[in-house]
Amino acid sequence: MTTQAARVRKMFGSIAARYDIANHLLSCGIDFSWRERAARIVTDWHPHSVADLATGTGDLALALQKKLPDAEIAGVDFLPEMLELAKQKGLRQPVLADAMNLPFGDGSFDCVTIAFGLRNLENCAAALGEMSRVIKSNGHLLVLEFSLPTTRILRALYRFYLHRCLPLLGSSLTGEKNAYGYLGDSIEEFPSGDAMCQMMVENGFTSPTFEPLTGGIVTIYTATKQ
């Protein structure tokens, strides 16, 4: 395991038990609407099989299960602590695996989703290539990820929240300050907008789009497998 993967595993493993409540409180509950929007987009594609990578406690995978009751929805994560919580919430197909090295054959899924997980992977481009590998031709990718707001004032306020407030609030909720300090740094460093779309094109996808939500605090990216 690489140093980055070990660091991420340690951080998220330590906050697994309070991961859901912390996310909902720190986002003031808006994270529900973000996942709902993502789930509606995927539903409109009418997939028969979906792999939700970095599924965590399964929120997006569970939303897809409700909207696509006849589809096979695999929730993939490399943390057994997270998958156990996802199973307790009703995830039907948990898969313990690393998103960088998926245990699926080429073209296994109509769609791959990943919510708030891509920036945590050591090599974003390689991860996109692995996602492309397991998606069927003309299948779809959806990425839901944090980004920086588009307006100057909102961006400044958001950065203050990310770097000054969030680590303290996250620590009080989970007892783990480093995970939430890392969150702000990883959002700053992650490619967004056109840069993210270009990376998708360079790693097996066509027709990329992006849709900022909540002033650009998060962005939904979609693309089609070549």
Please describe what each predicted stretch is.
Residues 1-18, 162, 173:
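N-terminal, positively charged/glycine-rich alpha-helical extensions of SAM-dependent methyltransferases
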Residues 6, 147-199, 203, 209:
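C-terminal alpha-helical "lid/dimerization" subdomain adjacent to the S-adenosyl-L-methionine
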Residues 204-226:
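Core SAM-dependent methyltransferase catalytic element
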Residues 49-101:
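Class I SAM-dependent methyltransferase SAM/SAH-binding core
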Residues 125-140:
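A short glycine-rich, Lys/Arg-flanked "PGG" loop and its adjoining helix->strand segment in the class I
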Residues 100-111:
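A short acidic, Gly/Pro-enriched loop at the edge of an enzyme's catalytic core
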